[in-house]
Amino acid sequence: MEENNKANIYDSSSIKVLEGLEAVRKRPGMYIGSTGEEGLHHMIWEIVDNSIDEAMGGFASFVKLTLEDNFVTRVEDDGRGIPVDIHPKTNRSTVETVFTVLHAGGKFDNDSYKVSGGLHGVGASVVNALSSSFKVWVFRQNKKYFLSFSDGGKVIGDLVQEGNSEKEHGTIVEFVPDFSVMEKSDYKQTVIVSRLQQLAFLNKGIRIDFVDNRKQNPQSFSWKYDGGLVEYIHHLNNEKEPLFNEVIADEKTETVKAVNRDENYTVKVEVAFQYNKTYNQSIFSFCNNINTTEGGTHVEGFRNALVKIINRFAVENKFLKDSDEKINRDDVCEGLTAIISIKHPNPQYEGQTKKKLGNTEVRPLVNSVVSEIFERFMLENPQEANAIIRKTLLAQEARRRSQEARELTRRKSPFDSGSLPGKLADCTTRDPSISELYIVEGDSAGGTAKTGRDRYFQAILPLRGKILNVEKSNFEQIFNNAEISALVMAIGCGIKPDFELEKLRYSKIVIMTDADVDGAHIRTLLLTFFFRFMYPLVEQGNIFIAQPPLYKVSYSHKDLYMHTDVQLEQWKSQNPNVKFGLQRYKGLGEMDALQLWETTMDPKVRTLLKVTVEDASIADKAFSLLMGDEVPPRREFIEKNARSVKNIDI
């Protein structure tokens, strides 16, 4: 009871001050990751996360983000409102302290927040430091307060009470990024929509609104998912055929003791999962709403529970004998879509990226929660239980049969030329940091590329026709495919679950296909393979797409190369009186070696598009939709996006 009373008291004593703000503008990258597009969006998330924390604590029911022209960014919630009394340490108003002192926030007072993704003051002061204008309105007990800052956190006057308000409680923060520090680039609506919808799924019952007023036709979005993770699973599996209709889900809050530390934590675990008829696993994990893309102890606990329960039921129901090889973690995850979300007051992460959860006390807790709900489901639904066991046994059998083929793709040394595919024209250097692999469509274009390349650092691997669609294939089919085997051997890392990034032979892997429909299909097949089986290469930014020209314009003894119809029309409108010859390239094979080098392979003049993934769950849905078996959703997607297909951003 005493603990609950403390949590309900939110005043200046709840805000702990740790250090000053001076370093933020000098080294912004240390605080928000970068000064570019990613950092710009990070500023939004710092303020949004404060509001989400209020909602997670049960103090707010809605969060609203509004974007106006000229980068005016506004976040509103109906939480408790930042305390307005004088802070005992700074002798300034607590509102001013929160937005001007780095790490002055409720995060460091466990009575104010039990868990946190971002907190009043923790990131808010950083956003203020990187803003040219920063304003805050606080509503407490039907009174309205206002404070403003400019030029990186310089306060303009004291906190003022502007009178009474119909709004009982809450906070509004409005800021404009300072582009003398930040690089100017537009907010991306797709990135914002993706993250806000994800937050709505992860925090059931909270309404999140987004109003984008930057265009002539304002757009608004609103999300509220009372089903939480169950609705998230339905959303992710929308383009896949489920093995059964029910989503297995549970949530539990327990007090656990930290391993090797005399501390107890109240941890909330939420899980939801469903099997489908594909061969790919889609497991997404979160800690305090932050995507732990590299997994961690919560994912380990989840997988261990599946292995334990499925093997036990397989033996008890005579699918396996005690002496048989048991189903492993890869087998049980084939065709599985799962969300694991935990709320922890003191998360610990492994490595510098902070994308892998390291709290050891989480593993047995998640294992226990998943084991209990999964065992109950298997007992109460014997038909579905048998379907799960049969699917995992098929995965096990395919894995066994693929072992021999898999060994062929492994190489003791990434530079062991005796293990390289015969059609690979390798480069001379053994330095992976400068070497490049061009994956070229067809033997003809491959031959031209071999002649035109700089053989010191550029390797060429021609592919014969379209590679296997891995979205519809199991392990055995994939490992027995000649083109994929050649690709895997050339790159040198193996594929999941045995992927080893340190064995990568080339820093750039460049997909070079014709600029036609077939070329686009081959490119998509390759991207599907990389996303499903070599995801770290996508995540680390090693995959690129070459941009061969579409046209050659010849005039006055000059040759110009154009990559798009728009470029050609622009040139024609700017040169209305120039007589010129025009050649349209239907494929790479129509260029000679010198032209291919000068237009597409020479690092001094070429254009390469780096393949990136902003949200793995969205990319997962896109590949399932475009490359899977379900025709109606694919037709709907194409009809909806046909006119803007060139702008699809995976």
Swiss-Prot record:
GO terms for biological process: DNA topological change; DNA-templated DNA replication. CDD domains: HATPase_GyrB-like (cd16928), TopoII_Trans_DNA_gyrase (cd00822), TOPRIM_TopoIIA_GyrB (cd03366). The keyword Cytoplasm applies. Residues 400-414 have a biased composition (Basic and acidic residues). Its EC number is 5.6.2.2. It catalyses: ATP-dependent breakage, passage and rejoining of double-stranded DNA. Residues 435-549 form the Toprim domain. Signal peptide: none annotated. One of its GO terms (cellular component) is cytoplasm. Keywords: ATP-binding, Cytoplasm, DNA-binding, Isomerase, Magnesium, Metal-binding, Nucleotide-binding, Topoisomerase. Its main location: cytoplasm. Binds two Mg(2+) per subunit. The magnesium ions form salt bridges with both the protein and the DNA. Can also accept other divalent metal cations, such as Mn(2+) or Ca(2+). Mg(2+) 1 binds at E441, D514. It is found in: Cytoplasm. One of its GO terms (molecular function) is DNA negative supercoiling activity. It comes from the Bacteria. The keyword Cell membrane does not apply. Residues 400-422 are annotated as: Disordered. Its cofactor is Mg(2+); Mn(2+); Ca(2+). SMART domains: HATPase_c, TOP2c. Few gyrases are as efficient as E.coli at forming negative supercoils. Not all organisms have 2 type II topoisomerases; in organisms with a single type II topoisomerase this enzyme also has to decatenate newly replicated chromosomes. Heterotetramer, composed of two GyrA and two GyrB chains. In the heterotetramer, GyrA contains the active site tyrosine that forms a transient covalent intermediate with DNA, while GyrB binds cofactors and catalyzes ATP hydrolysis. A type II topoisomerase that negatively supercoils closed circular double-stranded (ds) DNA in an ATP-dependent manner to modulate DNA topology and maintain chromosomes in an underwound state. Negative supercoiling favors strand separation, and DNA replication, transcription, recombination and repair, all of which involve strand separation. Also able to catalyze the interconversion of other topological isomers of dsDNA rings, including catenanes and knotted rings. Type II topoisomerases break and join 2 DNA strands simultaneously in an ATP-dependent manner. Belongs to the type II topoisomerase GyrB family. This is DNA gyrase subunit B. It comes from Mycoplasma genitalium (strain ATCC 33530 / DSM 19775 / NCTC 10195 / G37). The lineage of its organism: Bacteria, Bacillati, Mycoplasmatota, Mycoplasmoidales, Mycoplasmoidaceae.
